Amino acid sequence: MKTLLLTLVVVTIVCLDLGYTMTCYTQYSLSPPTTKTCPDGQNLCYKRWFAFIPHGNKFFRGCAAACPKAEHNEVVRCCARDKCNL
């Protein structure tokens, strides 16, 4: 009986974890931090900015299924933890 109860507890924990969704920062540049729950399948947070802007960098943040490719003079950083793209 104890084994059955333990098995049910473990199965419940595993099933609850399957519904996990990522949360990322989504603000543009230096706006106050905002967060977004990412859609299913988007399990990465990203932060992208242009490397050579004379009067400070403009940052773009959000969720992604795959790390976005950096364009010319652009830097992209991706991570796989909640709110890791600040």
Curated annotation (Swiss-Prot):
<comment type="subunit">
    <text>Monomer.</text>
</comment>
<dbReference type="InterPro" id="IPR003572">
    <property type="entry name" value="Cytotoxin_Cobra"/>
</dbReference>
<feature type="disulfide bond">
    <location>
        <begin position="38"/>
        <end position="63"/>
    </location>
</feature>
<dbReference type="GO" id="GO:0090729">
    <property type="term" value="F:toxin activity"/>
</dbReference>
<keyword id="KW-0800">Toxin</keyword>
<keyword id="KW-0964">Secreted</keyword>
<dbReference type="InterPro" id="IPR018354">
    <property type="entry name" value="Snake_toxin_con_site"/>
</dbReference>
<dbReference type="Pfam" id="PF21947">
    <property type="entry name" value="Toxin_cobra-type"/>
</dbReference>
<comment type="function">
    <text>Binds to the muscarinic acetylcholine receptor (CHRM).</text>
</comment>
<feature type="disulfide bond">
    <location>
        <begin position="24"/>
        <end position="45"/>
    </location>
</feature>
<keyword id="KW-1015">Disulfide bond</keyword>
<dbReference type="InterPro" id="IPR045860">
    <property type="entry name" value="Snake_toxin-like_sf"/>
</dbReference>
<dbReference type="GO" id="GO:0005576">
    <property type="term" value="C:extracellular region"/>
</dbReference>
<keyword id="KW-1214">G-protein coupled acetylcholine receptor impairing toxin</keyword>
<keyword id="KW-0629">Postsynaptic neurotoxin</keyword>
<comment type="similarity">
    <text>Belongs to the three-finger toxin family. Short-chain subfamily. Aminergic toxin sub-subfamily.</text>
</comment>
<protein>
    <recommendedName>
        <fullName>Muscarinic toxin 38</fullName>
    </recommendedName>
</protein>
<keyword id="KW-0528">Neurotoxin</keyword>
<dbReference type="InterPro" id="IPR054131">
    <property type="entry name" value="Toxin_cobra-type"/>
</dbReference>
<feature type="signal peptide">
    <location>
        <begin position="1"/>
        <end position="21"/>
    </location>
</feature>
<dbReference type="InterPro" id="IPR003571">
    <property type="entry name" value="Snake_3FTx"/>
</dbReference>
<keyword id="KW-1213">G-protein coupled receptor impairing toxin</keyword>
<feature type="disulfide bond">
    <location>
        <begin position="67"/>
        <end position="78"/>
    </location>
</feature>
<keyword id="KW-0732">Signal</keyword>
<feature type="disulfide bond">
    <location>
        <begin position="79"/>
        <end position="84"/>
    </location>
</feature>
